[in-house]
Structures are given as structure tokens and as C-alpha cells.
Amino acid sequence: MSSELSNFFQSLSIQEEELEAWVTNLQPVFPMQEKPSCRRCDYKPKYRNTVSPHNPNGNAGRLYYICIKCKTDQDCEVSKTDHQKGWISWDDDRGVHPSNQNCDCGIVCRQDRAGENSSCPGRGFWTCATGSCGYSSYRKDGRTEEEAKDAKAAPDGGFEPWLF
């Protein structure tokens, strides 16, 4: 076999490894090309919102989507607190990194931090980067509580997010 042909096949195997790594750690693109749908009721928001410049959580100016149907529905039991009601997703790549574990959508998840109005202000957690699935974890390793129970692992508490 000629060295030129050998080099070609060698480059193919490198590309194959890179492709496998890329497929394993798919990253979402921000800003989102399409408005996300609410994972609770499938509503597609008409507008993208911007966090107030006076936000105390360090999120001033960040873009995000909420579901107005779930936000105003008094009977919505999915979110028990007002600050979570109707939340869909941030529309930026803050906290999204190729080394993050994958969520239930198969894309890398987002590392985030609970706001000051939450029951655990400042607590780190993992969530779906685009809000498409219900993935959420307060574990350092990103496993859900069900996955941790299945693995019979010792519980690990919350963590301080590295990105803040």
C-alpha cells in the first residue's frame, strides 16, 4: 500500500474518533435557532425575555424563555414555587461545557445555580441546557437520584458550581 493511501486511512480513523467524541458530547447551539417548547404543555413562547439589570443573582441581561401558560396557570402542580413556574430555559451557553454529562436529550447539560428566592439559594445543579427534557440533578456527578439508587451509591450533597 502506498504511503499516501496509508496516510489517508490513518486520517479516516482519527476523524472517526473525533466524530465519536462529538456525537457522545453533542452541544446545543445558542442563541437557539428555534424557540423551545415547554416540556410540560408543549406551548411555544412568542418572545424571548431578558433578565432585569437589577437581578441579584448575577443573571442581569441574560436571555431566557418562559411558558406563559404554565406561569399563569394556578392549577399547575409541576412547579410548586412561583420562581420555577413556567420556566423553560436560558438562551445562552453559560454553564454548558463539552465535559458536562449528557441529559436525557442526549446533549450536554447545563450547570446552573439556584437563585436567592429558591429553597436552597446558591446550590449548584445540573439541568437540560435547552429545557427540552426534565433532566435535573443536584449530585456532583450529575446522576439523577434514581440512577444513584440503582447504582447503590452513597448520596452526595449539593455543590458549588464552578462557573460562578
Q: Where in the sequence are the language-model features?
A:
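Intrinsically disordered, low-complexity linker/tail regions enriched in polar/charged residues
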Residues: 2-164
